[in-house]
UniProtKB/Swiss-Prot annotation:
Guanine nucleotide-binding proteins (G proteins) are involved as modulators or transducers in various transmembrane signaling systems. This protein may be involved in the determination of the cAMP level according to nutritional conditions, most probably as a regulator of adenylyl cyclase. One of its GO terms (cellular component) is cytoplasm. One of its GO terms (biological process) is adenylate cyclase-activating G protein-coupled receptor signaling pathway. Keywords: GTP-binding, Hydrolase, Lipoprotein, Magnesium, Metal-binding, Myristate, Nucleotide-binding, Palmitate, Transducer. This is Guanine nucleotide-binding protein alpha-2 subunit. The lineage of its organism: Eukaryota, Fungi, Dikarya, Ascomycota, Saccharomycotina. It comes from Kluyveromyces lactis (strain ATCC 8585 / CBS 2359 / DSM 70799 / NBRC 1267 / NRRL Y-1140 / WM37) (Yeast). A lipid is attached at G2 (N-myristoyl glycine).
Length: 554
């Protein structure tokens, strides 16, 4: 179920990004293939074999011998859209067209999609249309770039008025029910689900091959099938969004957070806010930013902020005087100017800083209880290994292992490496201009590339599939306007085009796949529950497809 690119196409030249294949083909045929005779099944299996697949973001595509591809994409209303299309390759460095794969229809679509980003990572042959587009030709100004999801919850890149964080927070806080996203994702489950017999058959077969059902394939005394969990590793460098993904799955599949669990995050939220204030004060000193004459705080206030050793775990609430100082500091024009200055890449500030400071009045209230969105936005360093069992449905259980991403934590991963079915590797797209906290001489994105290289080419993962989350696309889109990607990666030539930039980074990771593992890339925003719901619906389809292939059905 993957966009299966040959090794030659993956290593070709690029215009701001890698070569990939355009999606096409009718997904309904895949469902019908299951019902074909034995002879047809064998022929289908031959036509669909491919190594080193790069699987399209929210859809899963396979090359056939004829150069066509199969795709099932999710449309805006939550249904699966089908179609047949030619395999497309990326343009080369001179933006030359590949005439064999271009036709007038493709050119029309490419012209319409020139500024589109959707849930599919695709390459177009038109020299002006290197982009990541969705199946509905959504415009980047009006639609979120990574999904075909209703804009009732999600904002456009250029600042639509809807506040998605507030909307999600209100929905979850009022109902604690992940299914009520103002109609968002309606029909996704139905669209992506097979009939009961297909799902049951798949899960039994997959579980048997992985030793996850009893030897006879029997059922538990209660009549339900005994299915253990498939092992899934959440890997990636520090602050790439691994733990946030796990939090979203808890919201979607474990009824969210109890009041007690929400309260456990208070000290971490307080710590995030206080440390952000200290980071800002340090940055102002480093770059000699003077306070305004009419500022309501003084340098001595900043001295006190930097010298105080706060213990968030012992704070029942955020002290009023501290909250006032932090709010004034954040709202200073000189501070806001610093955040968009040429110095921004030279100092650390957590991704959710603006979110917490915009909500500082609420958070500093004496009876403050964190919201779901507060929890998702919280930076909480993972130390050691944490495991969580997630039921994607009644017959598919995933055992997630979340491990620390900092260098000091990586040596602990070895204990999780046996019998791994799936690796979810998280990359923060927005970290291209940042350095490691533990080594300020090492670029974070380069570090992620090194780590990804060691993972995909490790003998431990020779039989594993890799899901690549290109995360924090929202922050990446905003940062790209002000911080040139080519400043840190000189071989990138796509300028401020977010489509080319995202594909370039994907290309850098794909080039490291010497072991020819199947790679399934997804453009994600881990803080967005609806986005993660869609992505994991696609991942469920990926597991299903792989199971059917392994069993010889496809």
């Amino acid at each position: 179920m993957g966009l299966c690119a040959s090794k030659d196409s993956r290593e070709s030249t690029h215009d701001g990004g890698p070569r990939v294949n355009r999606p096409g083909a009718n997904d309904a045929n895949r469902r019908n293939d299951v019902r074909k005779g034995a002879g047809d099944k064998k022929q289908d299996k031959k036509n669909k074999k491919a190594k080193g697949s790069i699987v399209n973001a929210a859809s899963n595509i396979n090359n056939s011998s004829s150069g066509k591809t199969k795709i099932s994409t999710v449309s805006e209303d939550g249904t699966v859209s089908n179609g047949v299309g030619n395999t497309a390759e990326y343009d080369n460095a001179n933006n030359k067209n590949n005439g064999n794969n271009n036709n007038s229809n493709n050119n029309d679509n490419n012209n319409n999609n020139n500024n589109n980003i959707g849930n599919n990572i695709n390459g177009n042959n038109n020299n002006d249309s290197e982009n990541i587009h969705d199946s509905n030709n959504s415009n980047i100004e009006n639609k979120r770039y990574f999904n075909n999801i209703n804009t009732g919850v999600l904002n456009g890149v250029n600042g639509n008025s809807t506040n998605s964080d507030k909307a999600l927070s209100n929905q979850f806080d009022q109902s604690n029910n992940s299914e009520t996203h103002s109609g968002t994702m309606t029909g996704i489950s139905q669209a992506l689900a097979l009939n009961d017999s297909g799902v049951n058959g798949f899960d039994t077969d997959l579980a048997k091959r992985n030793g996850t059902v009893n030897a006879s394939g029997g059922q538990s005394p209660g009549g339900s099938e005994t299915v253990n969990a498939l092992k899934v590793l959440l890997l990636g460098s520090g602050e790439s969004g691994k733990s946030t993904v796990l939090q979203q799955l808890k919201i979607l599949h474990q009824n969210g957070f109890s009041r007690e669990e929400l309260l456990e995050y208070k000290p971490f939220i307080f710590d995030n806010i206080i440390e952000t204030g200290k980071d800002l004060a340090k940055a102002r000193r480093t770059f000699n930013v003077q306070l305004e004459e009419d500022a309501e705080i003084s340098e001595s206030d900043l001295d006190e902020l930097l010298s105080q050793q706060y213990q968030p775990t012992k704070l029942p609430c955020l002290p009023a005087d501290l909250a006032k100082t932090l709010k004034i500091l954040w709202n200073l024009q000189s501070t806001q100017d610093l955040l968009v200055s040429e110095h921004r890449s030279s100092f650390y500030l957590m991704d959710s800083a603006s979110y917490f400071y915009e909500n500082l009045d609420r958070i500093s209230e004496p009876k403050y209880i964190p919201t779901i969105t507060d929890v998702i936005r919280t930076r909480k360093k993972t130390s050691g290994i944490f495991d969580t069992m997630i039921d994607l449905d009644k017959n598919l259980k995933l055992h997630f292992f979340d491990v620390g991403g900092q260098r000091s934590e990586r040596k602990k991963w070895i204990h999780c490496f046996d019998n791994v079915t799936l690796i979810i590797f998280c990359v923060s797209l927005s970290e291209y201009d940042q350095t490691l906290l533990e080594d300020n001489s090492q670029n974070r994105l380069e570090e992620s590339l090194i780590l990804f290289d060691s993972v995909v080419n490790s003998r431990w993962f020779a039989r594993s599939s890799v899901v690549l989350f290109l995360n924090k696309i929202d922050i990446f889109a905003e940062k790209l306007r002000h911080v040139p990607l080519e400043k840190y990666f000189p071989d990138y030539t796509g300028g401020k085009d977010i489509n080319k930039a995202a594909k370039y980074i994907l290309w850098r990771f794909v080039q490291l796949n010497r072991a020819n593992l199947n790679i399934y890339p997804h453009v994600t925003q881990a803080t967005d529950t609806s986005n993660i719901k869609l992505v994991f619906a696609a991942i469920k389809e990926t597991i299903l497809e792989n199971s059917l292939k392994d069993s010889g059905v496809l």
